[in-house]
């Protein structure tokens, strides 16, 4: 299977203020980038899939980023600046299909999108319910919006419609849908990181706990426990004993103790949606 992650432009201005001028797939989440999560999920479903990502051709990758792309085996396609999404996708697909079998199903995942449970059947559009007032493509019923994941069993036909609809990716998808109906697949775990508000909301739902720890974030509170109770207790002690003049710079400890169900030590903190250093 062939997968294109569309990340050929830079993040919007609000996100640029926070993170600088970067492509959306390189947005940080904890100690990783978004594309590392995307590639990990895709490989979980299909280990041998070929993953491509479009990046602005004027973006200068750091040595760390180059190493990361090599490690996760994602092939970079540099695309010219100032292209529409439709033009960028068409440009990328023309490069891909010069070298690879064009009979394989094509999957497209937007670079600012994370979906944990993917469907690998052909000819689908992933949709989700949303009341947010963003420029997402909407279906006619039930407030369903397109959430950035598509598949096409006839890539050549989709490329033809992209060629005829260079100014509108949506129009190309709709034209394909008229000829080969695309099944709407409802997803409950869509995370959109393409806007500042949705980025912080999404990030709070992706914890970075290690295997021996348990962490959850809910209603503005971080709850943490783990196998090593002494370590968890020591962390809680640290928060309890921060000098008063320093507490303004740290999240407030809400409670700590022994969990009644697991019998393990835990503590909970105020959740502050700040970016890590």
Where in this protein do the model-derived segments appear?
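A conserved alpha-helical element in kinase catalytic cores
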Residues: 224-264
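ATP-binding glycine-rich loop module of kinase domains
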Residues: 210-240, 270, 277
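N-terminal nucleotide-binding beta1-loop-alpha1 segment
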Residues: 1-22, 26
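Conserved core of the sugar-phosphate nucleotidyltransferase
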Residues: 103, 113-185
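Short beta-strand/loop segment that forms part of the nucleotide-sugar
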Residues: 48-58
């Amino acid at each position: 299977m062939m997968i294109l992650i569309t990340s050929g432009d830079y993040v919007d201005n609000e996100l640029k203020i926070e993170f600088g001028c970067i492509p959306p797939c390189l947005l940080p989440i904890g100690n990783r980038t978004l594309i590392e999560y995307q590639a990990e999920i895709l490989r979980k479903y299909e280990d041998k899939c070929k993953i491509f990502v479009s990046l602005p051709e004027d973006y200068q990758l750091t040595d760390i980023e180059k190493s990361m792309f090599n490690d996760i085996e994602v092939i970079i396609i540099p695309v010219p600046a100032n292209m529409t999404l439709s033009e960028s996708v068409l440009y990328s697909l023309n490069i891909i299909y010069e070298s690879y079998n064009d009979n394989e199903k094509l999957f497209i995942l937007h670079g600012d999108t994370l979906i944990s449970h993917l469907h690998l059947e052909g000819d689908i559009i992933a949709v989700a319910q949303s009341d947010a007032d963003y420029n997402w493509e909407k279906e006619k019923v039930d407030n369903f919006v397109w959430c950035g994941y598509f598949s096409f069993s006839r890539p050549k036909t989709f490329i033809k419609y992209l060629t005829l609809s260079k100014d509108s990716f949506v129009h190309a998808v709709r034209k394909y849908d008229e000829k080969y109906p695309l099944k709407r697949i409802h997803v409950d775990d869509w995370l959109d990181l393409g806007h500042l508000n949705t980025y912080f909301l999404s990030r709070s739902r992706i914890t970075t706990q290690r295997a021996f720890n348990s962490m959850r974030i809910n209603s503005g509170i971080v709850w943490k426990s783990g196998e090593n109770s002494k370590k968890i207790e020591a962390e809680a002690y640290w928060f309890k004993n921060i000098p008063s003049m320093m507490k303004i710079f740290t999240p407030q400890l809400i409670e700590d103790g022994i969990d009644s169900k697991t019998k393990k030590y835990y503590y909970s903190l105020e959740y502050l949606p700040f970016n890590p250093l």
